[in-house]
């Protein structure tokens, strides 16, 4: 995932055959030399051969410590649906103006989100809030908070993630 654009490209596809059961693994290597660790996130997805477009798992791996990342400024927000779904869950739409990492949603409403602390390219993503008990739409919407990594970094946000020019400073 390129921070500047949100573009995703495939670096490698590896076919593996694993035995059934827990504790099975396969090792392989992927050439990461074409990536700048400060401007990219490695997305690792696992798919079954019978359903290649349905991920079984998705892992997001930083290639550099968070403090070394050059993330763009991102405005991230979320909106709660006006009504609960038939099963009692509530749709939450998350929007980001730029790539954002560790997008985290919190609320005082009792329950959990279908995903949290995730990487998000620019655009929109639908999550589900799973309440404990009766959904409290008003409480969920009123207390919903969305945070992400970039505002907590100590250096200025990257204007262009591929820029090698030093940042100007005022004296």
Give the residues covered by each predicted segment.
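Intrinsically disordered, low-complexity Pro/Gly/Ser/Thr-rich segments with frequent PxxP/GP/PP motifs
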Residues: 1-42, 110-137
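Extracellular and select intracellular beta-sandwich modules with Ser/Thr-enriched
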Residues: 10-12, 55-63
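Short, aromatic- and glycine-rich surface loops/edge beta-strands on solvent-exposed regions
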Residues: 36-55, 136-157
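Low-complexity, acidic Ser/Thr/Pro/Gly-rich terminal tails and inter-domain linkers that flank the onset
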Residues: 62-86
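Structural beta-strand segments of beta-rich domains
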Residues: 88-92
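Asparagine-centered strand-capping/turn motif at beta-strand->loop junctions
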Residues: 93-98
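Short, hydrophobic/aromatic beta-strand segments
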Residues: 100-107
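Mature N-terminal, pre-catalytic/accessory segment of carbohydrate-active enzymes
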Residues: 160-166
């Amino acid at each position: 995932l390129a921070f500047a654009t949100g573009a995703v490209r495939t670096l490698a596809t590896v076919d593996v055959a694993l035995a059934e059961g827990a504790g099975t693994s396969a090792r392989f290597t992927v050439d990461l030399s074409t990536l700048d660790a400060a401007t990219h996130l490695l997305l690792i997805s696992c798919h079954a051969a019978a359903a290649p477009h349905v991920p079984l798992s998705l892992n997001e791996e930083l290639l550099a410590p968070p403090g070394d990342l050059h993330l763009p400024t991102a405005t991230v927000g979320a909106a709660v649906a006006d009504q609960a779904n038939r099963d009692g869950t509530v749709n939450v739409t998350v929007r980001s103006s730029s790539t954002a990492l560790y997008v985290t949603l919190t609320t005082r409403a009792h329950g959990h989100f279908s995903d949290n602390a995730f990487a998000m390219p620019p655009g929109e993503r639908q999550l589900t809030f799973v309440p404990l008990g009766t959904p409290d739409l008003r409480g969920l919407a009123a207390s919903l908070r969305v945070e992400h990594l970039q505002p907590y970094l100590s250096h200025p946000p990257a204007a262009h993630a591929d820029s090698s020019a030093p940042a100007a400073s005022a004296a």
